[in-house]
C-alpha cells in the first residue's frame, strides 16, 4: 500500500452537521476500501484562490492515508460525483 495525502473542499453553504457528515462519508469511502487513515485534519473555512463552482470560500479537510490504488480511485470517483465536495487534490507521498 502507498501513502497518500488527500485534501478536499466542501461547499460553504452547507449546515455544520452536513459538513461533518460529508467529512465522515469521505473517510468511510477510504476505510471501506481497505485504507488506513493515519492523520486527519479539519482546516475550517478558508477563502479560495479563485471561484470554484460559484463559491469563493470552502471548508478544507486533509487526510493522510495508506491505501491501495483501488481505494484512491474510488475516493476520486465519489468526490467527483458528490454534490457536497467542490474540489479534491490527491498527492502520493514518498517514503
Task: Cite the ranges covered by each PLM segment.
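Structured, basic alpha/beta domains of bacterial-type, RNA-associated proteins
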Residues: 2-95
Amino acid at each position: 500500500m502507498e501513502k497518500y495525502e488527500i485534501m478536499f473542499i466542501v461547499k460553504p453553504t452547507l449546515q455544520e452537521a452536513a459538513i461533518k457528515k460529508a467529512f465522515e462519508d469521505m473517510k468511510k469511502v477510504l476505510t471501506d476500501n481497505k485504507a488506513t487513515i493515519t492523520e486527519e485534519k479539519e482546516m475550517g473555512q478558508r477563502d479560495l484562490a479563485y471561484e470554484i463552482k460559484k463559491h469563493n470560500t470552502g471548508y478544507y479537510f486533509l487526510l493522510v492515508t495508506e491505501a491501495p490504488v483501488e481505494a484512491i480511485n474510488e475516493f476520486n470517483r465519489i468526490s467527483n460525483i458528490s454534490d457536497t465536495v467542490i474540489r479534491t487534490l490527491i498527492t502520493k507521498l514518498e517514503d
